Amino acid sequence: MNYYQIDSKNINSSKYEMPHTIEIVNDETLKYIESKDSDIEVFLQNQSNFYAEFPDISLGNLIDRDDVVDYMDVSPHCSSIKAVVSNKVKKILESLSVNPIEYALKEIRIKGFHDHFYLLFVPIILNKDYYFPECEFVDIFDESKKYTFKDVDEYNKNDNGFLTLKHICLNEKYKNYDLLYPREGSVFMSERLINEFDNHYIWALCT
């Protein structure tokens, strides 16, 4: 299966300089995020509980835009919350029978808009599941600088904190996944999911 990073594959994207962003504003959600996501290592050990116990409904404001789109950034940062998505995106995920273990959705109500929107959670994949010889990393400041490593030990010795995955290869467990979120990169989407977004004119700004 072919995959695309959503920051390198436009999905009927507008050409604004900055993405549409939804700011979470309700205290319950903000306090929950602060209490559960202050330490990434602790978070990674409790990902499934994080989704299950997350508030069922959050409140948000659209920042510096007149209208919403189907795929938006979210603020503040929270591990594995990758976007705010429309009901249209939700229906596509369901129609393709994307495995529920690949994502979670929680409702967010956006001030001034009556449409249904959701926080999209994608579980973080740890590098123990990478097949390193076929993974390609690039420098976040200069993507012409490309790196490959024979294993996780070699990666750890050479990681300067500025490397991100550009091409990913995982073990067999993930071969039919549509959504992949490696810890050292951004979200990858399957070609069939991207194509379905194109077919349904999903209006998005890639993050």
Residue ranges and their predicted role:
Residues 1-207:
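Phosphate/anion-contacting hairpin/loop surfaces
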